[in-house]
């Protein structure tokens, strides 16, 4: 899942440099959502493993 976030972040950066506002905005939004989902899952896995 982190790979998808990185891929969409790279697409957003490239599209932003080239000036494609709509594509950059959509890719950046997807990258942000995937990043936060991954971050939440990471924190949950840390908390659950600490209990064992």
Swiss-Prot record:
Sorted alphabetically, the keyword list is:
Cell membrane, Membrane, Transmembrane, Transmembrane helix
Q: Does the keyword Transmembrane apply?
A: yes
GO cellular component terms, alphabetically, are: plasma membrane
Record carries keyword Glycosyltransferase: no
Listed disulfide bonds for this chain?
none
**Segments traversing the membrane:** 5-25, 27-47
Predominant location category? membrane
Which family does the entry's similarity section mention? Answer: Belongs to the UPF0391 family.
Spell out the protein name for this chain: UPF0391 membrane protein Csal_2627
List the taxonomic lineage: Bacteria, Pseudomonadati, Pseudomonadota, Gammaproteobacteria, Oceanospirillales
């Amino acid at each position: 899942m982190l790979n998808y976030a990185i891929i969409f972040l790279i697409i957003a950066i490239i599209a932003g440099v080239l000036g494609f506002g709509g594509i950059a905005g959509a890719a950046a939004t997807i990258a942000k959502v995937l990043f936060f989902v991954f971050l939440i899952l990471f924190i949950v896995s840390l908390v659950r493993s600490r209990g064992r």
